[in-house]
């Protein structure tokens, strides 16, 4: 049996941190004072300084300061606002660090109705679901390029890193969720660094670092590195694993209106869990150009290539790999309240071979808005399409009424990426990747009432599908699709300020009249949340939370099932109590968290794939201008 060496690198991380800090000249850092420094939350909310502000600076000072020279590739920014009413959530860099998430599954699992599908600890496959969405249940766009699945029907979230990511957006649509990610955007003309290092139970260690220089090598340069390792739940490291990623980007800018970016991201995972591939890796290389001929109009073109590789078995020397490319372009229009997004993508292979889509809408901060979407793609020359619409209206300042509707067909691939190696069935025979098409319809309508910092919302839910598809990852690879079903349900949320300033009671609840694969009848979230900024300078900030995440017993897809019917098995109810705390002093963040505080020993999303019985974790997160 091949052994995978998973090293504890607590000393390495701390040493690297010490070297980085000591290598920075003290005079090159911005000394803290009574004024909030440039990389504080206030600056991140203000966003990038626009060209007019730079021009004003040049006129007033009659000289050019290096700190005022920086450019970003133009990109559209208007869309549906993030809220429970629209079903959209967003995180900026400060939000991600405050959450303490180490991957997308951890970032999303606190949201109403969202379940993280985990195969174990770090290094094992992971995914997410909402509304019972399985195969083809979500897509990922990163800097405008699609991060398509290299194996199965959805991307393995363990292979999607957060190094260098400054913003994440989740659109929790009932037909297909959309995850969008954006890499670092410059806010200042000085070099900038982010250092994150942590350690915890089960020999868990984290290091994530990012360095960006907006004026280097005739353009701008950014690099990132991250690693997470653990010995896992098993004794003597029998379930040890790690995930390691890197990122590099070079951009050439012609002012604020045109730029070209070359981007590379590589990621690999290792695990000793015998049910999973011991080594999995993917890399994504892309070239992207963006042009803004006039204010409010953005054109972009992009090309990318992804490669994927696995060790077929722990006791085998066989290495399997494949690759796939994509080409495409997009057009975006923003005029006052109106916005439009459209794109076309051509993929190597037939699963899918191409996709064209458009989204448009109106949005007003006082009165609300409406939006619509359309998408069409080809799977083995079969055209599938879907449409969606949503509205959120504010008849009063404290009331928001909302509704959304999605209907269409959605493609899902079974097997590895097109153009790569074929899948191996249970008899060791090669099988070509195939496509499954599912018809889905979903609707949601409700109201949110907010007054004086308190909010109460609820919505009626409807969902139907002609079939339910497995993810196609190692989590349920080989499972047979389930029969369709029609369900009704409702969900609610509450935010209630209580006796202490900055302290809220927050919660969400979702109920369905019938369970389904990846959709338990009840899902609940509840927590006490504290967030407050102290001192007039704003240089002291505190977050704290104590809560619970849980759901009823759940049906999951499995390949070899002995306890359920067909390809379905039932796992016990899930309940995990947790706490988190973070204090920010100027730009240094000290973070502490505990998961599964009650030490429940049968937490699982798949039969016999037990999750860690408890973990406390401490991390230092520091961003600084160099």
Give the predicted meaning of each segment:
Residues 29-99, 185-190:
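N-terminal periplasmic "start-of-domain" segments of outer-membrane beta-barrel proteins
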Residues 145-172:
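Short acidic/polar hinge/loop motifs at secondary-structure boundaries
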Residues 186-191, 215-219, 254-259, 292-298, ...:
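Short loop/turn motifs that connect adjacent beta-strands in outer-membrane beta-barrel proteins
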Residues 197-201, 227-231, 264-270, 303-309, ...:
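Transmembrane beta-strands of outer-membrane beta-barrel pores
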Residues 237, 255-328, 349-355, 373-381, ...:
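Flexible loop and strand-edge segments within Gram-negative outer membrane beta-barrel domains
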């Amino acid at each position: 049996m091949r052994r995978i060496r998973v090293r504890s690198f607590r000393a390495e991380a701390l040493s690297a941190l010490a070297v980085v800090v000591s290598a920075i000249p003290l005079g090159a850092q911005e000394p803290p004072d009574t004024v909030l420094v440039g990389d504080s939350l206030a600056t991140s909310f203000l966003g990038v300084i626009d060209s007019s502000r730079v021009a004003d600076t040049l006129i007033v000072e009659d000289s050019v300061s290096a700190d005022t020279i920086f450019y970003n590739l133009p990109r559209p920014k208007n869309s549906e606002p993030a809220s429970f009413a629209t079903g959209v959530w967003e995180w900026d860099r400060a939000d991600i660090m405050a959450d303490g998430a180490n991957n997308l599954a951890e970032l999303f699992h606190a949201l109403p109705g969202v379940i993280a599908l985990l195969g174990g600890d770090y290094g094992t496959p992971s995914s997410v679901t909402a509304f019972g969405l399985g195969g083809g249940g979500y897509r990922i766009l990163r800097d405008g390029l699609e991060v398509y699945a290299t194996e199965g029907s959805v991307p393995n979230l363990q292979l999607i890193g957060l190094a260098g990511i400054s913003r994440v957006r989740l659109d929790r649509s009932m037909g297909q969720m959309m995850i969008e990610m954006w890499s670092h955007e410059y806010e200042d003309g000085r070099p900038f660094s982010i250092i994150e290092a942590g350690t915890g139970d089960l020999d868990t260690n984290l290091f994530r670092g990012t360095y960006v220089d907006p004026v280097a090598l005739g353009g701008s340069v950014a690099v990132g590195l991250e690693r997470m390792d653990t010995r896992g739940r098993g004794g003597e490291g029998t379930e040890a694993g790690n995930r390691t990623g890197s990122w590099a980007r070079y951009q050439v800018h012609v002012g604020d209106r045109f730029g070209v970016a070359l981007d590379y991201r590589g990621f690999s995972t290792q695990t000793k869990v015998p049910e999973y591939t011991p080594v999995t890796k993917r890399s994504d290389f892309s070239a992207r150009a963006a042009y803004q001929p006039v204010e409010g109009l953005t054109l972009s073109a992009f090309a990318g290539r992804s490669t994927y590789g696995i060790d077929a078995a722990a006791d085998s020397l066989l290495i399997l790999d494949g690759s796939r490319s994509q080409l495409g372009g997009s057009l975006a229009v923003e005029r006052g309240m109106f916005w439009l997004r459209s794109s076309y993508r051509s993929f190597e292979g037939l699963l899918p071979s191409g996709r064209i889509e458009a989204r448009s809408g109106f949005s007003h901060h006082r009165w609300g808005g409406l939006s619509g979407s359309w998408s069409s793609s080809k799977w083995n020359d079969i055209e599938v399409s879907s449409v969606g619409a949503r509205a959120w209206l504010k008849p009063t300042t404290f009331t928001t009424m909302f509704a959304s509707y999605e209907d269409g067909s959605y493609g899902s691939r079974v097997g590895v990426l097109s153009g790569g190696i074929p899948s191996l069935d249970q008899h060791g025979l090669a099988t070509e990747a195939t496509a499954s098409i599912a018809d889905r319809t979903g609707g949601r309508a409700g109201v949110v009432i907010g007054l004086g910092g308190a909010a109460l919302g609820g919505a009626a839910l409807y969902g139907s599908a002609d079939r339910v598809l497995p993810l196609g990852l190692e989590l349920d690879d080989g499972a047979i699709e389930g029969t369709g079903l029609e369900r009704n349900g409702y969900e609610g949320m509450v935010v209630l300020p209580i006796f202490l300033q900055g302290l809220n009671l927050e919660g969400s609840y979702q109920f369905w009249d019938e369970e389904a694969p990846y959709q338990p009848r009840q899902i609940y979230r509840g927590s006490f949340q504290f967030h407050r900024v102290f001192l007039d300078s704003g240089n002291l900030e505190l977050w704290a939370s104590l809560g619970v995440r849980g759901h009823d017993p759940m049906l999951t897809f499995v390949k070899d099932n002995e306890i359920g019917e067909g390809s379905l098995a039932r796992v016990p109810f899930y309940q995990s109590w947790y706490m988190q705390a973070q204090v920010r002093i100027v730009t240094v963040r000290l973070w502490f968290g505990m998961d599964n505080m009650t030490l429940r020993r049968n937490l699982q999303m798949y039969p016999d794939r037990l999750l860690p019985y408890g973990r406390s974790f401490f991390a230092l997160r520091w961003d600084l201008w160099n």
